[in-house]
Amino acid sequence: MNREQEKKNYRTLERLVRGFSNHRRIQILEVLKKAPEQSVDDIAKLLGINYKTAADHLRRLAIAGLVLKKSDSVSIRHKITSRAEYVLKFLRTLE
């Protein structure tokens, strides 16, 4: 592997780790694991946080490849990716 590929791999890992490096984001992943297809409003209400905060965390999770967004006629629904499931399993090993 050359240096450029190595740098790219490290940046990819950094983006992934930054995606779940917040307790609220981990909570959101747990919520979506138990109840997929939630809207931003649903998640905000479940966690007792404001809409804007929930939306920002979901955006960061999506950038990290941990959450997928699906648009329906009324709202955008979110679900975790298989990568997020691995992350949650990994985090459980650290408890």
Description of each model-found segment:
Residues 58-59:
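Short, hydrophobic-biased segments on the C-terminal half of alpha helices
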Residues 23, 35-39:
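Short capping segments at the starts of secondary-structure elements
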Residues 63-73, 79:
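Beta-hairpin "wing" of winged helix-turn-helix
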Residues 12-13, 17, 34, 75-95:
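Conserved segment of winged-helix/HTH DNA-binding domains
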Residues 45, 62-63:
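Alpha-helical residues within the helix-turn-helix
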Residues 26-30, 86:
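Pre-recognition alpha-helix immediately N-terminal to the DNA-recognition helix
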Residues 2-26:
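Short alpha-helical segments that sit at the start of domains
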